[in-house]
């Protein structure tokens, strides 16, 4: 499963400005989803990969 990560407080996606491989997105995805997650910047928001099915 894949998808954007959102802020639980306001429901907004995590913004990013460097498209493609992005250390910020990778770090945020791993923090919120787990060590096996991947992440990159897609359409100026952080996109996470390898999410659990219940995410």
Curated annotation (Swiss-Prot):
TM region(s), chain numbering: none
Pfam families referenced in this protein's UniProt entry, alphabetically: Toxin_3 (PF00537)
Main location: secreted
Cystine bridges: 16-41, 25-46, 29-48
GO molecular function terms noted in the UniProt entry: sodium channel inhibitor activity; toxin activity
GO CC entries: extracellular region
SUPFAM superfamilies reported for this sequence: Scorpion toxin-like (SSF57095)
Family per similarity comment: Belongs to the long (3 C-C) scorpion toxin superfamily. Sodium channel inhibitor family. Beta subfamily.
Annotated protein name in UniProt: Beta-toxin Cn7
